[in-house]
Amino acid sequence: MKLKPFLSLLAFLVVSIAGAQTLKGKVIDDQNEPLLGVTILVKEVPNKGATTNEKGEFSINVNTNQTLVFSYIGFQSKEIKVGKQKNLVVTLIGEAEELPELLVVGSRAGGRTKIDSPVPVDVFDVAKTSKTQPQVNLNQILNSIAPSFTSTTQVVSDGSDHLDPAQLRGLGPDQTLVLLNGKRRHTSAFINVNGTPGRGTVGTDLNTIPSFALSKIEVLRDGASAQYGSDAIAGVMNLELKKDKGLSAQVSYGGHLTPTANDHRGNFDGGQGQLDINYGTELGKKGGFLNFTFSAQFRDKTHRAGTFDGDIFNAYNAIERRALNHGDNLSRYFSNINVNADPRLLRLIKGYAGEVDYFDSSYLAQIQSANSIADLQPILKKDFTEQELAYRGLNRKDYNMHVGQSSLLGTQFFVNAAFPVSDNWEIYAFGGQSYRYGEAGGFFRRPNQARTFTGLYPNGYLPKITTDIQDSSISAGIRGEAGKWHLDLSNTFGRNEFAYTIKNTGNTSLRFASPDYFDAGKLRFAQNTINLDLSRPIELFHKSNISFGVEQRHESYSTVAGAENSYATYDITGGVLPLSAPASQKVTDFFGNALPGGAQVLPGFREESALTKTRNVWAGYGEFETDITQWLLANAAVRYEHYSDFGNTFNYKLATRVKLFPHVNLRAAASTGFRAPSIHQLYYTNINTLQINGVLQETGTFNNISRAAELFGIEKLQEEKSKSLSTGFAVKIPKAGLSLSADAYFIRVDDRIILTEAFTRPAGNSPAENELKQIFDQANVSTVQFFSNAVDVETKGIDVVVSHSLQADKFTLNNDFAFNLTQTRKVGDIHTPRAIKAAGLEEKFFSERSRVLLEEVIPRFKATLSHNLTIGKWNGYLRNTYYGKATGPDVIAADKRIGDFVFDERGHQVIRGKVITDLSVAYNFTPKTSLTLGVNNLFDLYPEKNVKVNNNNDQFVYSRATSQFGLNGRYVFLRATFNVF
């Protein structure tokens, strides 16, 4: 990054400050009582404003030609032209209507409310609802209150257990742009390669930002690439940090009280607690502010497996246990059973077999008659699970996987500040640091599996994936007016690191020398963005505004290798196994199966996968918005971007709003958009242990510049290109306290990037196939997968939002209803490379499972109905959310029923929709202290169970591949809120 030009321009702007004035005043109600927390915004300047203190007083820097907008919940908003006034006393009149929120997203002109916006924008007052909301992190909050938003906690999905993929309008997590205070937020370093929603994508980790630091969230439900750049195909989410003054705190504790807790043994699990503190103060005497938020939280695991009903122990395991009782470890008598077994081993096995009291005489006779280890091997594979469990004092639930939310421990610290350097200019800064430690489980390694070295783990083990996620960001800039121009120059830096440590596991090829934890490496992503935005009103038609700007973005992506023992396979001498090593050098179990290398559950990043890649992006954009008349608004935006790694893109957007009546608007928009392949998708390479057709396999994800991709004919990634259309209307009836909006949309995305299914090791002997075999063997994988611009998709749907507010003498009632109906479909032919098509592998390139993950694993229909009632010191909140049906990705039974289970015409299990009820009651002991008791999922509902053939021996009782409302059941919580001063 070249900081010198940026700092020079910053200094130039500071010393080129235009003269203006400081306006002071007071806001009161119609009873002459001061109003605390009134929002005061400069209509012409997005993000510039102030709030009143406990005396109703405020101070703000403005120009004489600007307009102030005063707004407060339960009162009519008021606009006042500044002129030459130095002091103001503003009286707000109460009215039963919704607070008019001035939007940051959707238009650079500023000063628009969501009812007057030419595109649909939802505004969620996080600060207002934090007292009564059951949810505490952003993903959970948005999943509950925003029908077009979907995100649930993932289970047994490697890193996805620690980062919840989030989707808007059914599109990918990487097709929604996230802003913080109007500035582009960096994405996570993690890329989801498991078989869960959002597979193959990179999203923004919303949970690095504490919800207590936010005043509101704006969700722009429309394509906006022409305004904001890459990723804004589905829309834009803008998170606004608090500017409050004073000290407030919140303490929450809750957990899951449900009969399914603790693997269906009941009681309570998944306890979680959170402490939030926010402090704000004035900065200077001209309306500056400084606001801090600290948040700390812990979350325990939930356990939702059933009872493992598969095989666990065979006869060899039983004999091995009896030998261990005598201090004799049978694994010490061989390292490769086929070449170096100690001659004593046969005699020892026969001897200890006699101590297994449940072996009948006939079976013992078979063992005693064996003349070699080869004779014993088929005999000792016999299952004796029930008998051996009883002998060892274990039960089947001891072999359950950890199926449920991961545990975590985290902290966040965020700051938001602005300081006027004159009456007309201010410098600002915001950002934060967060840390999150998480622990999740993988697939259980049972004693009768080759993946388990029973010399160290005679009872098997449950490996754990732990992550250390560190995230930091800082944005700083200067903004103000130079004449009629509003300028905003900023620099935003963000960095995310995702580090893996694998615990309670082993590298089986190391046998007795294996540690039980491994440094598996880390992923890093950093992004630096420099923006210069300019806008000004112009005298054209009724009212017009022109905006333009430039942006330079630098991105860096790194893979850091893990320790050698986290990924290497070792031979019988303890050295790294050469690629050309004969079978006689490989470490085996008793039955002759080669013991796999690398940390079980998740091998580390290999040395040859380590890399650091960078790219630069340059952009220029312009936007023109005009009220042609008082009833007709038009907006046009264009954007050009150049990427150093794949080329150029040009996009546009047109939008209009027609005011039929003072509070009745029609709106429509058309745009093109794009999403550049993330730098992660371009260069990520790693090996994961995935379940494929019910079998655990090491699967390599190879990037598109690899030799393997070239041999398979996988083409280099290009940008996704989109076209969007939307139309709708917005109606507001102030005297009835009612507002309504409905919007229909259509989005086509060409060249959607997906992660292919896994290709198996070639069996032929052509030169290309022989080379691929070497690549497979060198990476120690049995299957490989790639990223590819594989398909074109179309998404269409409708959003409806209805809000009603009723204020009476003794109570206030707010009602909100919203629903989203959406459908995503693959259209046209699959973009299959010639080599793959010629080999008949098109189903592996984009499978039926891939189609369902793209189209149907999240609900197509979602609706919420909420009520918020305040009576005196009491506040009650009731919300019902309907999560529509979803479809499991696995093909099981075509178009029929199996008991209570329903399947569609293609054989996928249908997960039917359900209504989830949330209820909370709060009591305000004083104006500054309240206590809330609440229940999320009041009636303890769960998704439909997996059909038996698809529940992995009763481990995945509920699908882990679909995303409705999670699988944790009823959640109860208690929350105390304090406004100290």
Predicted regions, residues:
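Surface-exposed extracellular loop regions of Gram-negative outer-membrane beta-barrel proteins
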Residues: L241-D263, I379-A390, D398-Y399, G404, ...
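C-terminal beta-signal and adjacent terminal beta-strands/loops
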Residues: S188, R748-V749, Q823-K826, Y882-R897, ...
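Short, acidic, small-residue-rich periplasmic hinge/interaction motif at the N-terminus
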Residues: I28-E33, V38-V45, T67-F75, G83-K131
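A beta-strand signature from Gram-negative outer-membrane beta-barrel systems
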Residues: V90-T91, R185, R199-Q250
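Gram-negative outer-membrane beta-barrel transporters
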Residues: A744-D750, T756, T760-I892
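Extracytoplasmic beta-strand/coil segments of soluble accessory domains associated
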Residues: S59, N139-A189
